[in-house]
């Protein structure tokens, strides 16, 4: 079995936490790796952003990343990438033709890639499996007042994919409900595949490992630590955590607390200075420490150094950071949105907050910061909870989905395109 995965707007080899790289990158790379270890041949097609990348990167046996030149290497935002859909699709088609590669299934990730996959499906007469990761209609429902709404053009493209993909893969049952409610999707075409965490990499630390992690990060040993890991964009809610920190320090100015925010700017209107300035304005610049994005091997130290990991997002299809933190033995305080109520067992492995107010977040953080036995017990339960989610299990499910897709009778391409949105 040979799979053409498409991740146009971001390479799975890019550093998560900066630019457009995030949970989707982690998902694509880890599922592809596990599929390759099951014997599935996987080529991941992405848009080249540097000439030094090379056309073909051999990641491991049976897994390659193919960098397709489509437009300039630099200077295009994600919002401008639709102008390069034709060039990118043509690049994939020419690669497969020149190297005489035949694929059995296309698996596209995100709506931009889905548009490419939709056309290639008709050209190659093979099934299309699509994973949206985020949906315009859902993001618009949950966006903040000063967030730019997703465009109607994107929503139309997503509707086309819902109507025309052979199988839709989602992370949670909540995503299934979202597709049905906002896009009138058929439940028969939707399959839930829960993401996982690398439980070999993300493991609970001993007291000695926690001390070492804190020394590496320059954090005092007897200080409580709350960590945030993710892109610095409004949708991820780093400002919520900073405001909650100010509320905590106002309640108890002598509180020994450090808040570590690890991530980089994302989006045209995003800048780390926004959050640095906010911390300064609220008087917590000495409490909040900003770190640049870290590779997974270094994120382990941040999770192990933290007493709590905060995930104050306005929406998450699943919440990989929450799962990685729990695998590391750290309880999570998360917003009760999207897939986070599935990723976090409320009251057992962390707490869910049903608003984004600084007061409510300070209340939740305070509960765990001031209750060592409860927090430690939650951390222990978090490890067991995370063990239920694995990339190996997700890949096994995907392999079965691909096999099912290959058995679908593919209608005539002209008839199929005639029913486009």
UniProtKB/Swiss-Prot annotation:
1D-myo-inositol 3-phosphate binds at residues 9, 20-25, 78, 110, 134, 154. Keywords: Glycosyltransferase, Magnesium, Metal-binding, Transferase. GO terms for biological process: liposaccharide metabolic process; mycothiol biosynthetic process. It catalyses: 1D-myo-inositol 3-phosphate + UDP-N-acetyl-alpha-D-glucosamine = 1D-myo-inositol 2-acetamido-2-deoxy-alpha-D-glucopyranoside 3-phosphate + UDP + H(+). Its EC number is 2.4.1.250. InterPro entries: Glyco_trans_1, Glyco_trans_4-like_N, Glycosyltransferase_grp1, Mycothiol_biosynthesis_MshA. CDD domains: GT4_sucrose_synthase (cd03800). UDP-N-acetyl-alpha-D-glucosamine binds at residues 15-16, 23, 231, 236, 294, 316, 324. GO terms for molecular function: acetylglucosaminyltransferase activity; D-inositol-3-phosphate glycosyltransferase activity; magnesium ion binding. Mg(2+) binds at residues 303-304, 306, 330. Catalyzes the transfer of a N-acetyl-glucosamine moiety to 1D-myo-inositol 3-phosphate to produce 1D-myo-inositol 2-acetamido-2-deoxy-glucopyranoside 3-phosphate in the mycothiol biosynthesis pathway. Homodimer. Belongs to the glycosyltransferase group 1 family. MshA subfamily. This is D-inositol 3-phosphate glycosyltransferase. It comes from Corynebacterium aurimucosum (strain ATCC 700975 / DSM 44827 / CIP 107346 / CN-1) (Corynebacterium nigricans). The lineage of its organism: Bacteria, Bacillati, Actinomycetota, Actinomycetes, Mycobacteriales. The gene is mshA.
């Amino acid at each position: 079995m040979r799979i053409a995965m498409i991740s146009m707007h971001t390479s799975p080899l890019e550093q998560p936490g900066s630019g457009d790289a995030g949970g989707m990158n982690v998902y694509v790379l880890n599922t592809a790796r596990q599929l390759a270890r099951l014997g599935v041949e996987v080529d991941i097609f992405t848009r080249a952003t540097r000439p030094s990348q090379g056309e073909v990167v051999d990641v491991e046996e049976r897994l390659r990343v193919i960098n397709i030149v489509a437009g300039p290497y630099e200077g295009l935002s994600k919002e401008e990438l639709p102008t390069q859909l034709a060039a990118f699709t043509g690049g994939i088609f020419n690669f497969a033709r020149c190297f005489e590669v035949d694929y059995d299934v296309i698996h596209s990730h995100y709506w931009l890639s889905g548009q490419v996959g939709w056309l290639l499906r008709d050209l190659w007469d093979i099934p299309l499996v699509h994973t949206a990761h985020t949906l315009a209609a859902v993001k618009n429902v949950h966006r903040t007042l000063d967030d730019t709404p997703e465009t109607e053009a994107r929503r139309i493209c997503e509707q086309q994919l819902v109507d025309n993909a052979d199988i839709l893969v989602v992370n949670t049952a909540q995503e299934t409900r979202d597709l049905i409610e906002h896009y009138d999707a058929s439940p028969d075409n939707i399959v839930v595949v829960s993401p996982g965490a690398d439980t070999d990499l993300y493991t609970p630390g001993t007291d000695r490992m926690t001390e070492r992690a804190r020394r590496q990060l320059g954090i005092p040993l007897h200080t409580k630590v709350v960590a945030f890991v993710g892109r610095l964009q409004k949708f991820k809610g780093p400002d919520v955590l900073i405001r909650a920190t100010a509320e905590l320090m106002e309640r108890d100015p002598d509180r020994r607390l450090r808040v570590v925010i690890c991530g980089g700017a994302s989006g045209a209107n995003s800048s780390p200075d926004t959050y640095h300035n906010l911390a300064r304005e609220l008087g917590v610049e000495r409490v909040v420490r900003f770190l640049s994005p870290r590779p997974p091997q270094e994120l382990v130290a941040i999770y192990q150094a933290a007493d709590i990991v905060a995930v104050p997002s306005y929406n998450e299809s699943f919440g990989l950071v929450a799962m990685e933190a729990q695998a590391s033995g750290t309880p999570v305080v998360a917003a009760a949105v999207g897939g986070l109520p599935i990723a976090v067992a409320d009251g057992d492995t962390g707490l869910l907050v049903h608003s984004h107010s600084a007061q409510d977040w300070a209340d939740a953080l305070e509960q765990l910061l001031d209750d060592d036995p409860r927090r430690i017990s939650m951390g222990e339960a978090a490890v067991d909870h995370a063990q239920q989610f694995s990339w190996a299990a997700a890949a096994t499910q995907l392999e079965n989905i691909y096999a099912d897709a290959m058995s679908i009778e593919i209608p005539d391409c002209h008839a199929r395109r005639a029913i486009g949105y």
